[in-house]
Amino acid sequence: IHTTAQMQVVLVKPDRFDNVSDIAEHLRSKHAVVLNLEATNKDVARRLVDFLSGCAYALDGKIKKIAISTYIITPYNVDIVGDLIDELENSGLYL
């Protein structure tokens, strides 16, 4: 019997820090999370990124800034690859 686990990507656009526990739960469930902070207050956005960076670290995951105010947080079993990611890392513009 062949079974394939389906990876899920969750898109979130939090407006307050209270949303962080739901986002952390997605990470604990091994879902990748795209975090859009465009409409989030700067102080709240910083707290969210700090907390979720800690969650990613504790779960052996990764967090990468992929655009202005947008991050991707992945579980340990997901690699982030691609020309855009390499370009962003090499230029130092976003990471």
Predicted regions and their residues:
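Positively charged, small/polar-rich N-terminal and surface patches that mediate targeting and assembly
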Residues: 1-33, 57, 62-95
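Loop/helix-junction capping segments adjacent to catalytic residues or to phosphate/diphosphate-binding pockets
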Residues: 17-20, 42-46
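Feature captures the catalytic cores and cofactor-binding loops of soluble hydro-lyases/lyases
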Residues: 44-50, 55-62
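Short, glycine-/small-residue-enriched flexible loop/hinge segments at domain edges that mediate gating
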Residues: 33-41
